[in-house]
Regions:
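A contiguous active-site-proximal alpha/beta segment in oxidoreductase catalytic domains
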Residues: 1-44
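Active-site loop of classical SDR/Rossmann-like NAD(P)-dependent oxidoreductases
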Residues: 147-160
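Short acidic, glycine-rich loop/turn motifs
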Residues: 90-95, 135-142
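Short amphipathic
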Residues: 34-38, 73, 148-149
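Contiguous beta-strand/loop segments that form the cofactor/metal-binding neighborhood of enzyme cores
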Residues: 52-129, 159-170
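Alpha-helical elements of Rossmann-like donor-binding domains used by nucleotide-donor carbohydrate transfer enzymes
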Residues: 19-23, 60, 161, 186
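C-terminal helix-rich "cap/oligomerization" subdomain common to oxidoreductases
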Residues: 4, 161-195
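Mid-domain beta-loop-alpha active-site segment that forms a flexible
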Residues: 9-18, 40-71, 158, 180
Length: 195
């Protein structure tokens, strides 16, 4: 009997996100200098806890920048009664900085931005559930828009991957690898200890 465990990070199964990662790694905007993720917990599939919400942003950073971060800092703000209301998480890489902004009862504008030496990629709105992003490339007058159709919230694509894994007798997902999963767990542990 074999059991397959996988994170419910439906974002990594969306074609638009896969294309975004591919184009970023292909230097569409040059060398990546910064990744900025902002997410309002109230907008993110209501009822999710902080760890589930921050996992989406951490996953995006890991997929875009890799698992070899140098340090991570969490700067949580709590209300007078001790409830979490805002956090700014920074992840330092060798030549890149990632910032994750999460708010619960404060207004945070949902956005994912990848800033490079030759331009910027922006995923507006609910970027963890995206079918669309745009790139502003140095020397080009107009934005380049990328749009991909998908149905639902990505769960069907996660289930499709699980069925393929079972059929092929694989235990590792091809969209979020073991090493990435271990890095995510390590980052969550660090953030939860400091928050």
């Amino acid at each position: 009997l074999q059991v397959i465990l996988t994170e419910k990070l439906t974002m990594v199964y969306l074609r638009a996100f896969t294309q975004l990662v591919w184009l970023t790694h292909g230097a569409l905007v040059g060398d990546v200098v910064a990744v900025k993720c902002a997410i309002s917990q109230d907008d993110f599939e209501g009822g999710k806890n902080f760890s589930e919400t921050v996992s989406q942003a951490l996953c995006a950073c890991i997929k875009l920048l890799g698992k070899d971060y140098l340090e991570v800092k969490s700067n949580a703000v709590k209300s007078s009664d001790g409830c979490f209301i805002y956090d700014m998480i920074t992840m330092k890489y060798l030549r890149t900085l990632a910032t994750i902004e999460i708010g619960t009862t404060v207004d945070v504008e949902n956005e994912l931005a990848i800033i490079g030496t030759r331009g910027r990629i922006t995923v507006p709105g609910d970027w963890w559930n995206t079918g669309y992003f745009e790139a502003k490339i140095e020397g080009q007058e107009f934005l380049k828009r990328y749009s991909f159709n998908f149905e639902g919230n990505g769960l069907r694509y996660l289930l499709q991957e699980l069925v393929i894994m079972i059929r092929d007798r694989r235990t590792e997902c091809t969209r979020f690898f073991y090493e990435e999963s271990e890095t995510l767990a390590e980052l969550l542990k660090i953030i939860n200890q400091r928050g």
